[in-house]
UniProtKB/Swiss-Prot annotation:
This is tRNA uridine 5-carboxymethylaminomethyl modification enzyme MnmG. Its cofactor is FAD. Homodimer. Heterotetramer of two MnmE and two MnmG subunits. NAD-binding protein involved in the addition of a carboxymethylaminomethyl (cmnm) group at the wobble position (U34) of certain tRNAs, forming tRNA-cmnm(5)s(2)U34. Pfam families: GIDA, GIDA_C_1st, SAM_GIDA_C. It comes from Roseobacter denitrificans (strain ATCC 33942 / OCh 114). NAD(+) binds at residues 272-286. SMART domains: GIDA_assoc_3. GO terms for molecular function: flavin adenine dinucleotide binding.
């Protein structure tokens, strides 16, 4: 046994959570080690070759606002960009990019190699070095010990992972990679609440064997919406996707073989993602539907592989071949890799606090699918939070907590740590109460100041952000200081009530179908505002009234978040609480009254009782 360099932060796993965690800690100035089984596994897209989407695109923008790497790499690897929900309001529109798998991996590996304070360590983590109950390092398979002040575990689907194809099951973290079993056994010894989840992936098809001529083409947007606030344009050649559909014949084949599916054949105990069901689930759960849409997504510019989004499966290979060939355009499709389901261990995230630190195991943080989430973006956002907080702990500083009122990151962390998960968790805009102000377009305005205060933001981003804020402030002043009569507005084609009241340009901008083009008829000075700033101001004007009303709820939330709960607060002493609530509170250990209020089963009476006890305790301490 021998000892290696002592790190401030060690990260286990080089997936989306691990890379983001390692970069975040390194940007904070912590000496960081990233342990991965292989350099070729860093930044790998294990499932679909895409980043972003509804809710998920917001997370990527927020990661980028804090100078994370996912957004920039996704822009460099993007081969098709689309803004989803374009017909709806800006608050719920989500940027999405089809990615070239190889470019994404290569750019993420390059960024990781070039990141200061970050070392890549190739090896398998099999155990922790302990000092009493505290984690102080990691043991590798070759018995090498690497010591650290804090450790972040990001095992993805590798923790006791099992791959299922029909009735054939084998240990694996993903196709071609072995599972992490010894580490799983070690985690068992911590006594954490754990469970099993599953996810799945579709068969990969050969592009050359697909009849693209009979398929509907889905091109990207003419004006791509990028993820990073620093990106200037697309880097890779853009391509189209194809669209086809399952049919009655497809469904008959699947129904006739449903018991041969690993899921329906009783081989899988883990719960799968509700919003990304297998094709078997779709046929059974939506039996009245005769067709399901399939997006044929190229996996890159220099590969023959195509990802058929919509037909993930755990059926045997012969059945996969039969149902694929029943689909229009895929009659002669060659399957390059069979679809499969993967089952893995996860930790109930209620065992963590809002910093993603394990409550009962000091020095250990968890991020990604080990916390019960699904998706690259959710994993990366957790990695960012864990990386920042592990670095802060390593230097002896207080943790950073993201609020439900300031970010989707805050919404997700709060959902996980106060409510837990019964199925793989994914982000949606509907999960955010304050989504009108948590838009993808203003992620930098919400979070970059936090990043600057923490010290995790580069000088390049700081300068770009300051230039943008100055432009927004100038435009905002111009819009709020300029006012016009109803007659003037009418002459510019803006229909307002003739009530004699003057209205600011910002107020006029909030009227339906009013744009800067109309305002320029009132004063040519508005033409001098750049297009990006104009779009930002139009969104602000559109939501101004609603956000003003929403602010009251935000203030109430912040007030409740201000009621901090001591770590040693004794819920058992409160005779008015039910045993069920006492149990939930003792296991979750909420840190604020706001978190208490979001625990399942919490009543107004119980909340009042806890608040009264907090005030009583506060008076005693100050007396």
């Amino acid at each position: 046994m021998f000892h290696v360099k002592h790190f401030d932060v060690l990260v286990i796993g080089g997936g989306h959570a691990g890379t983001e965690a390692a970069h975040a800690a390194a940007r904070m100035g912590s000496q960081t080690g990233l342990i991965t089984m292989s350099r070729s596994g860093i930044g790998v897209m294990s499932c679909n070759p895409a980043i972003g989407g509804l809710g998920k695109g917001h997370l990527v923008r927020e990661i980028d606002a804090l100078d994370g790497v996912m957004g920039r790499v996704a822009d460099q690897a993007g081969i098709q960009f689309r803004l989803l929900n374009r017909r709806k309001g800006p608050a719920v529109q989500g940027p999405r990019a089809q990615s070239d798998r190889a470019i994404y991996h290569n750019r993420m590996l390059e960024a990781t190699d070039q990141q200061q304070n970050l070392d890549i360590i190739v090896g398998e983590a099999v155990d922790f070095v302990m000092d009493g109950e505290r984690v102080i390092g990691v043991v590798l398979q070759d018995d090498a010990e690497i010591l650290a002040k804090t450790v972040i575990l990001t095992t993805g689907t590798f923790l006791r992972g099992v791959i299922h194809i029909g009735d054939v099951s084998r240990s694996g973290g993903r196709m071609g990679d072995k599972a992490s079993v010894r580490l799983a056994d070690r985690i068992d010894s911590f006594g954490l609440p754990m469970g099993r989840l599953k996810t799945g992936t579709p068969p990969r098809l050969s592009s050359k064997s697909i009849n693209w001529d009979v398929l509907e083409e889905q091109p990207g947007d003419d004006e791509p919406t990028l993820f990073s606030f620093l990106s200037k344009g697309v880097s890779a050649r853009q391509v189209s996707c194809g669209i086809t559909h399952t049919n009655v014949r497809t469904h008959d084949i699947i129904r006739d073989n449903i018991t041969r599916s690993a899921m329906y054949g009783g081989h899988i105990d883990g719960v799968g993602p509700r919003y990304c069901p297998s094709i078997e689930d779709k046929i059974i759960r939506f039996a009245d539907k005769e067709s399901h849409q399939i997006f044929l997504e190229p996996e890159g510019l220099n590969t023959d592989a195509v990802y058929p989004n919509g037909i993930s499966t755990s059926l045997p290979q012969d059945v996969q071949s039969e149902y694929v060939h029943s689909i229009v355009g895929l009659e002669k499709a060659i399957i390059l890799q069979p679809g499969y389901a993967i089952e893995y261990d996860y930790v109930d995230p209620r065992a963590l606090d809002s910093s993603l630190s394990v409550l009962s195991v000091p020095g250990l943080y968890l991020a990604g699918q080990i916390n019960g989430t699904t998706g690259y973006e959710e994993a990366a956002a957790q990695g960012l939070v864990a990386g920042l907080n592990a670095s802060l702990e390593a230097r002896g500083s207080d943790p950073i907590t993201f609020s439900r009122s300031d970010s989707y990151i805050g919404v997700m962390i709060d959902d996980l740590t106060t409510r837990g998960v019964m199925e793989p968790y994914r982000m949606f805009t509907s999960r955010a109460e304050f989504r009108l102000s948590l838009r993808a377009d203003n992620a930098d305005q919400r979070l970059t100041p936090i990043g600057l205060a923490l010290g995790c933001v580069s000088d390049e981003r700081k300068q770009a952000f300051e230039v943008k804020i100055e432009a927004l402030d100038r435009a905002r002043r111009l819009l709020t200081e300029s006012s016009y009569t109803p007659k003037q507005a009418g002459e510019a084609g803006i229909s307002v009530s003739h009530d004699g009241s003057r209205r600011t340009a910002m107020q006029l901008l909030a009227f339906p179908n009013t744009s800067f083009k109309d305002l320029s008829l009132l004063d040519p000075v508005f033409d001098g505002i750049d297009v990006e700033t104009q779009q930002q101001m139009e969104r602000e004007a559109l939501y101004a009234t609603y956000i003003e009303r929403q602010q009251k709820d935000v203030d109430l939330l912040k007030k409740d978040e201000g009621h901090k709960i001591p770590a040693d607060f004794d819920y058992d002493q409160l005779s008015g609480l039910s045993n069920e609530l006492k149990s939930k509170l003792n296991s979750t250990r909420p840190t604020s009254l706001a978190q208490v209020g979001r625990i399942d089963g919490m009543t107004p009476a119980a909340l009042t009782l806890i608040l009264a006890k907090l005030r009583q305790s506060s008076k005693k301490r100050s007396a």
